[in-house]
Each structure stands twice: as structure tokens, then as C-alpha cells.
Amino acid sequence: MRGLQGRFRSAQSYRNDSLQRDSLRRTGRYFSFPIRGYATNAIGGIHGEGYRANGFDLFDYKARGSHPAQDIFVADRNQNSLDDRTSQPVDILSMSNGLVIGIETAWTSGSEYRGGNWIWVYDPNLHGLFYYAHNSAVQVVPGQWVQTGQKLGEMGRTGFNAYKTRSPTHLHLMYLQIQPDGLPIPLDTYPWLLTARLSK
């Protein structure tokens, strides 16, 4: 990751990273709301309470009980992955500038993986990873640089639990902050979503 970080960010002392990250995260202009045509009232729960990081382990997909993410819901009562208001797919947008480092596009209903069709984007300014899950379509490829607000894919119902009728159609959005020792630690994106730029 350090190689990627060095390639895609301005040359600054590593000891200033936390100050720079804190500054960027406080300004709403840095982030784009990740769903076109929707706003903060689409975020699940009250005041972001759906976020639960306790027990999270990125390297153990069988770990249960945590939910270190925000779910953002859309109007899709018939669960066909189309917006009830427009009868069109719902665009998933990149929250920030970054490098696509991984995607999944071949999820099937027989798979036990919970994320379905997902996208990982590395933000070298924040030195962290954004994870966008449950997409019906992925329209970026690994190695592609994306801009804030750029379309990554389309919302769907892929994933072990997300495709079931009990689950409303939503984006599962997670952010992992990479620590100096290289381990990823989840951070709540709710404050960023509240100030993010909206896209029509």
C-alpha cells in the first residue's frame, strides 16, 4: 500500500498523515454522497446507529455480530433493483478520488459471500479503503483511477442476505482506515455522509 500511496498522493511527510486526513474528513466538499438522486434521509437507522464495529474481523468472513458500515436504502418495493420513482437503475458513486483495487462481478445466489458484487477503492489521501457492496452491476476495473462522484456501478440485491426478500434494496458502505502496522480498522462514515455533496 505504501507504494500506491506514494504514487498517487503529493509528497508529504508520513508523520503529517493524520493531520491531513482529519482535515479532509472534516470538509464535506471532499466527499460525494454515494447514491445518485438520494440524500441523508436514505441512511438506515437513526443518526447512523446501524454502524457496529465490535467484533469485526476483515480476515474472518465467518465472524458474526458486527456491522461496521452504513446501509443506504432506496425506493424499491418490488425489489427489482430499479428506483420506484424513475424505473431506472440507481447509480453508485465514488465517495472520493481513489484507485479501484478489487471487484467481484460473478456473484450467484448459491454463494455464501455476504457482499455480493462488490467494489474496493483505495483513497491515497486518506490512506484507507472504501467498500461498496450488493451491486447489480460493476462498471469499473482494478487499476482504474476514479474521481469523486464518478459512477462505480448500479445498486442491486446481491449477497447472501441482501438478495432475500426480507432485506430492502440498499448499498452497504464501509470504510477501513489503514493503520501504521498495515491493519485495517473500520471508521464510521456517517459524519462524512451528512456533509457529502449530493448528485442529481
Locate predicted features:
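Polar/charged, compositionally biased leader and regulatory segments
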Residues: 1-91, 95, 191-200
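Acidic, glycine-rich catalytic/binding loops that coordinate metals and/or anionic ligands
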Residues: 1-5, 10-12, 141-150, 154-157, ...
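Short acidic, glycine-rich loop/turn motifs
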Residues: 37, 123-125, 177
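Small beta-barrel nucleic-acid-binding modules, principally OB-folds
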Residues: 70-84, 128, 133-135, 175-187
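Divalent metal-coordination and catalytic microenvironments
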Residues: 72, 98, 149
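Residue-level detector of conserved, well-ordered beta-strand and adjacent loop positions
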Residues: 73, 122, 133, 156, ...
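Solvent-exposed loop/turn segments at secondary-structure junctions
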Residues: 78-79, 106-109, 126-128, 137-139, ...
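Zn2+-dependent peptidoglycan hydrolase active-site motif and core
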Residues: 85-89, 93-136, 166-170
